[in-house]
Amino acid sequence: MIIVTGGAGFIGSNIVKALNDKGITDILVVDNLKDGTKFVNLVDLDIADYMDKEDFLIQIMAGEEFGDVEAIFHEGACSSTTEWDGKYMMDNNYQYSKELLHYCLEREIPFLYASSAATYGGRTSDFIESREYEKPLNVYGYSKFLFDEYVRQILPEANSQIVGFRYFNVYGPREGHKGSMASVAFHLNTQLNNGESPKLFEGSENFKRDFVYVGDVADVNLWFLENGVSGIFNLGTGRAESFQAVADATLAYHKKGQIEYIPFPDKLKGRYQAFTQADLTNLRAAGYDKPFKTVAEGVTEYMAWLNRDA
């Protein structure tokens, strides 16, 4: 069995899909379906069982067994960069991750987990997986950073695989439940389909992010499980492309619309990553050599998926 926490969420459900594509269906999905809309991410997927996150954590802390577990993909977390309840964030993202990590170490179960490019904070260059480059801007980034630091202490002594992925700006299918945290491509598509003008912040041609397609993210996760490499790795494309490029690809697919530029909100000033670009040196050195989709390629594929029933 393979366990996927956050398996009804965005990246988790895409990992479940990638496993299904390889013929793997003996999957336990762990999630919190209080937001009932997330079930749609699993409707077309095949899993063996579902468990609520709280029940799962109780069983993990009690040391209960789940049968022959081949790996745990730990994608479950509070991923809101605008959430400032630090206790909630640390309980959800840090303590929970530590409990799972030790459960896996004791049983030598491969543990693959979601870190984040938010660990780098507001820097504009040298996105390198090393302490001197890390300075998170929000409590979400701090919770991810602190767990990475914890993992670094344990890695040299670990007898089983531990791998963390610093996800950059992930976009693609199965993110509709994320609301304001969904990607720009998702929001632009929704606005166009509602007959509204698609909106970007003023200066969006200057805001550049490393936008990585979720299908590529899932492929990297599965490659690492198959190859047993440990460490903390950036997971982006290695390219910085503008929000304007995302909009251009969206409009090109729809063949209509004109961007409306809106003022940049005061509440985000100083807490907003204006530039991200993954340094893929360590990922490539680990042996992962597949190309990553460009924004034009990924957004076009995503638009086709979003509008498949149109």
From Swiss-Prot:
UniProt KW Ribosomal protein keyword: no
Domain of life of the organism encoding this protein: Bacteria
Active site: 140, 178
Residues annotated for substrate binding in this entry: 169, 180, 187, 201-204, 209, 272
EC number, as in UniProt: 5.1.3.20
Catalytic activity: ADP-D-glycero-beta-D-manno-heptose = ADP-L-glycero-beta-D-manno-heptose
GO molecular function: ADP-glyceromanno-heptose 6-epimerase activity; NADP binding
Record keywords: Acetylation, Carbohydrate metabolism, Isomerase, NADP
An example Gene Ontology biological process: lipopolysaccharide core region biosynthetic process
CDD domains found in the cross-reference section: ADP_GME_SDR_e
Modified residues (N6-acetyllysine): 267
SUPFAM superfamilies: NAD(P)-binding Rossmann-fold domains (SSF51735)
Residue numbers binding NADP(+): 10-11, 31-32, 38, 53, 75-79, 92, 144, 170, 178
Entry's cofactor comment: Binds 1 NADP(+) per subunit.
Summary of the function given for this chain in its UniProt record: Catalyzes the interconversion between ADP-D-glycero-beta-D-manno-heptose and ADP-L-glycero-beta-D-manno-heptose via an epimerization at carbon 6 of the heptose.
Family of this protein: Belongs to the NAD(P)-dependent epimerase/dehydratase family. HldD subfamily.
HAMAP family membership: Heptose_epimerase
Family matches, as NCBIfam families: heptose_epim, PRK11150.1
Record remark on domains: Contains a large N-terminal NADP-binding domain, and a smaller C-terminal substrate-binding domain.
The protein's assembly and partners: Homopentamer.
Protein's name according to its UniProt entry: ADP-L-glycero-D-manno-heptose-6-epimerase
Source organism: Shigella flexneri
Gene name in the database record: hldD
